[in-house]
Amino acid sequence: MKNNLRYGIRKHKLGAASVFLGTMIVVGMGQDKEAATSEQKTTTVEENGNSATDNKVSETQTTTTNVNTIDETQSYSATATEQPSNATQVITEEAPKAVQAPQTAQPANLETVKEEVVKEEEKPQVKETTQSQDNSGDQRQVDLTPKKATQNQAAETQVEVAQPRTVSESKPRVTRSADVAEAKEASDVTEVKGTDVTSKVTVTESSIEGHNNTNKVEPHAGQRAVLKYKLKFEDGLHQGDYFDFTLSNNVNTHGVSTARKVPEIKNGSVVMATGKILEDGKIRYTFTNDVEHKVEVTANLEINLFIDPKTFQSNGEEKVTSSLNGSKTEKNLQIEYKNGVGTYYANVNGSIETFDKEKNKFTHVAYVKPLNQFKLGTVTVSGTVTQGSNPNGEKPTVKIYEVTNDGKDLPQSVYLDASDKNKYKDVTNEMQSKLTVQENGNYTLNLDTLDKSYVIHYSGEYLNGTNEVNFRTQMFGYPEQRYGYYYNSYQLTWDNGLVLYSNKADGNGKNGQIIQNNDFEYKEDTLTETVTGQYDEKQIIETEENQDNTPLDIDYHTAIDGEGGYADGYIETIEETDSSAIDIDYHTAVDSEAGHVGGYTESSEESNPIDFEESTKGIVTGAVSDHTTVEDTKEYTTESNLIELVDELPEEHGQAQGPIEEITENNHHISHSGLGTENGHGNYGVIEEIEENSHVDIKSELGYEGGQNSGNQSFEEDTEEDKPKYEQGGNIVDIDFDSVPQIQGQNNGNQSFEEDTEKDKPKYEQGGNIIDIDFDSVPQIHGFNKHNEIIEEDTNKDKPNYQFGGHNSVDFEEDTLPKVSGQNEGQQTIEEDTTPPTPPTPEVPSEPETPTPPTPEVPSEPETPTPPTPEVPSEPETPTPPTPEVPSEPETPTPPTPEVPAEPGKPVPPAEEEPKKPSKPVEQGKVVTPVIEINEKVKAVAPTKQKQSKKSELPETGGEESTNKGMLFGGLFSILGLALLRRNKKNHKA
């Protein structure tokens, strides 16, 4: 009896435990069902780091492709890059990101997951979750727990992928080592080392030319030399290869700009080579990967050479050289600097020393010196930013240097070497009581006596976004009396203007095939194009696209096409090679400068790499003065250079006294021209219309004419069919004399209307057109005519040599000429270009099938990684899994990304599952959505199975094998327990 009771109690306990355990297994496995798909995917992980943002949020980009088979186990690859720490606890939550579909077909589906790591030290728990939304709409929670790692072995990451579940649930973890070391190493390579291919460069043509192809350069007039190269490269260029050439130390490529860059070499919109300036005048161009597999590569380079004011300080002849692969190009140039503005007893000169466009700052150097041993009394020197001043800027810095040896050794190039203490003495502190500096950028220096030469160094800023900067140096004073003579006061003004230029660079290439290692060959079919256009403040105006297979011609041309006129000022040039977007003065490049330019004009040249050909034509207008005015016993001498660069022709007012032409060429064009109202004298001059190769219909309106006609008035009609040479006739013309205009008033000369309709004409005559004449449309003419007024129309159909005729039909209506009012003393020409603009061509990458993957960012503080989260046991007696040890080499763990269907672009519906309720709700607003991109640098791991599932809208699923077996196992436990309990009851009854 006792044995039966003892066995019954044991069976009761065993049965109850079995029922409880089976129920827990069934419930737990039911909450965590996952459909195992039969698709094959390859898992690779690539990690890179970028700098953290200001708010300490770093982004880690992980490119993964998951391997899923119909087996029960799922494998994930990751590389641990985060160092766990027991002292620091970090919670990272992900914000939602957009999902993009893959762009090209790959053997495996590629995903890019961007996660923003936000560090919060207030929360004690260690937790790292990733919420993502895939195409099926379900959400998953990813837990990352680092495993053990020694210093001599790579750190590994355990990746757990599970659905939301209860706290007491514990799911077995499926892990495997990261086997993508090769892909990671390839992605970590940030710089490709190439070889020096200077020896493989052949100089076919080279030259150094002065301004306008002369041997003369005036640096203060904005002039510079140009280095021209035609280069040929041997085949087999690779990414990272470079070539160098060296310039002489008396020239540079930047002018007064603080930027030390050279423009990129482009083939259309593709960068073929990047340039940079090295020490000792060396320039290096490094090829990009777009030069791979290119053959017959040639380059045309035109680089500006600015005279260095530090090296060459005086007027004279200077030799400029450039060397490339043993080929030396040289030129003797005549250098001439300006002397500023002055009188017999004083002189003022200056220049803009540097110009920093990024910081909106510039420096200026001014010379103030007496001449001929005069002592000047009550002298006032002022510096003013007349254009481009920043009223809200900081106070400028002004330093004053006293020059020894009476200023005779001052460089003509207007250069200050403040470190030369023997030549320049800093007297700024002594002049503080006499110096006034204002916040708007102006300064004033008052001197009781000027008997020494001074150099004033100014450092200030200009208004951001301005298109012109002008700095004015002015001196006013009285010279001392000599020999009983009293000298008048004087005022000297010297303006330093700044003009910005832009470099251009374009080119095209020729594709070829190169056999490598005799094992395989590369044949590239990339797009070759040349895109040209015009840049100004309104961005792209016009583009032109040419597609061909010509050699790679790179054109760098930044020289001014032509400068004419009288330039008295100091015009400096800036060549700035900033690769960022240019926001100042794309329209201020000067093709032609005309007029009297007095003052110091500085030119800034921007050589940012663009593949559009700029139109650098402009109009320079301005008030120019170079005079001396004596008024009220005072003498004023002013030299100024006010340059305004205008894209559009200005309105003109006044009298038109010259021929006004309108020329239209080579197009079917309807031109409406007519004279409007003119104020002033009614002398039109000559109105000339030239139409080439066109069939012309002319409608003339002569209208009403009032006044007296004192001469013979005649109307002559010639309709003869046969005439000798130099006579008229040949056509029958119907004339309606009712339409002859009324003529009234006084005309001293013969008034005649002559019509020539002959068919045959001798040489040197024009004709060949049929013209309809309507005399009703004759315009009204009022006033006195003191000479013969002749209206002659020629309607010949046949002409001998030298005739002008055509095949295009053009209608001219004379009464639609634009209104011209005002006074014009020259010939006004209006040219109309009817070439239709070509829209810009979008940029096409040379290798669209291999886009560059995004670079993931490294956490800003790798010393505070996230330690693993211990799991909560379901029962008190259940042992807790051991916590992994801290790896010795910290790395950032990368969570696996949600799976993407094998066929991108088609949505995958979710598998039929029961609703799942997570035990811990995830914070709203902080989720991560995978961004699907293509990473060509990641080497995919070979799939475990060769056969992939066919593309379809609904992927094949392998059934719920692992979870069903668990539920079956739990159910058997429950049934066994119930059986034992029932048997126990029977024993009790017995």
Curated annotation (Swiss-Prot):
Residues 512-834 are annotated as: Fibronectin-binding. Residues 958-990 form a propeptide. B- repeats lie at residues 545-574, 575-604. Residues 851-920 are annotated as: 5 X tandem repeats, Pro-rich (WR). Keywords: Cell adhesion, Cell wall, Peptidoglycan-anchor, Repeat, Secreted, Signal, Virulence. WR repeats lie at residues 851-864, 865-878, 879-892, 893-906, 907-920. Residues 836-910 have a biased composition (Pro residues). The keyword Secreted applies. Residues 194-511 are annotated as: Fibrinogen/elastin/tropoelastin-binding. Residues 1-35 form the signal peptide. It is found in: Secreted, Cell wall. Residues 37-55, 741-752 have a biased composition (Polar residues). One of its GO terms (cellular component) is extracellular region. It holds the Pfam family Big_8. GO terms for biological process: cell adhesion. Residues 112-126, 179-193, 786-800 have a biased composition (Basic and acidic residues). The keyword Secreted applies. This is Fibronectin-binding protein A. It comes from Staphylococcus aureus (strain bovine RF122 / ET3-1). The lineage of its organism: Bacteria, Bacillati, Bacillota, Bacilli, Bacillales.
